[in-house]
Amino acid sequence: LELKDRSGNVIQVREERIGFRTIEFFPQDGIYLNGTRLIVKGINRHSFSVDGGRTTSAAMSRQDALLIKEMNMNAVRSHYPPDEHFLDMCDSLGLVYIDELSGWHGRYDTETGARLIREMVERDVNHPSVILWSNGNEGGWNTDNDSLFCKYDKFQRRHVIHPWADFDGLDTHHYPAYLTGVARFTNGYKVFMPTEFMHAMYDQGGGAGLRDFWDRWMTNPMFAGGFIWVFCDEAPKRSDRGGVLDSDGSNAPVGGG
């Protein structure tokens, strides 16, 4: 994109890669990518590196995205919009992404939320990896602002979700049990896609039963996949402790996950 003055002189240039794909959500059916039903094999990710903590880089984004692909996963979610270089890597490698309004607290007021939604959608709208918008995490939803996603995403109008909620045809209930409620899953009529399940952080072992959970959930024709918590343990290297990795949860220097 070139911006020129009245004399035709180029005064600003911006280059941006784009991609083409279709993404559709059908209630009581599922999510379709380029006309094919999508089962997300997802992971939740925080922006983190052992050496840099919350400081990120394009090299770190590439490393994480490649590792996620090598883990046979195809989808990523975070609690905030990621660095653009991570979305660039998702675009490039074929990973799909849930782009989420920042936070894990209560809902934003309407004015603040509206501003943040506009900033997120206008920045990320051209990334083909973004398949769903998320209006906040675990109770951070302000439904008064839901219509704004389509206002700024007026051509694709990607579906809006509320993680941890059964909302608008998509049940994203967090940490469902193996024998999750009959009404919710076995005899449910909503597309089922837990945006967090099998808490596997800090050696809790939550990921150990993945095969059993996955095989059971795949028996439901409305299962659309899910997102394990979490990609890595977020243990920073402590230069003041001889280089040990400190994963002491919320007591660690960069906070908990």
Predicted segment positions?
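Substrate-binding/catalytic cleft of secreted carbohydrate-active enzymes
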Residues: 65-68, 75-256
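N-terminal carbohydrate-binding accessory modules
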Residues: 1-70, 88
